[in-house]
Design a protein with these regions (language model features):
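Basic, Lys/Arg-enriched alpha-helical interface segments
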Residues: 1-64, 72-78, 88-90
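Short beta-strand-loop-alpha-helix junction that forms the active-site gateway
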Residues: 83-87
Length: 90
């Protein structure tokens, strides 16, 4: 099981997420738990590596326009950002 590490920006982003419907918040928790256990995400989450400024990171789509950016290094799951595509990539 990976140790969790949250970036300061992720903490700010997450404050917005907790205002979403509870089912979305639960889904975020389920995705993070799956990653923390080291299990592979279901195909529906479209997990893939990133390039450019985010090289070395991955993202997955918790919902169609709710993206989680993360990185796994040694025994740590680093949660970098969470939000819509436009918030994260524009």
């Amino acid at each position: 099981m990976y140790r969790l590490e949250y970036s300061n920006q992720f903490k700010k982003d997450f404050k917005k997420i907790i205002r979403m419907p509870i089912s979305d918040v639960i889904e975020v928790g389920n995705v993070i738990s799956t990653l923390q256990r080291g299990s592979q995400l279901e195909v529906k989450y479209v997990d893939h590596g990133l390039a450019g400024n985010w090289a070395g990171y991955r993202d997955c789509h918790v919902k169609p326009d709710l993206v989680l950016i993360y990185k796994i290094e040694s025994n740590t799951l680093k949660l970098a950002r969470i939000g819509s595509h436009s918030e994260l990539f524009n």
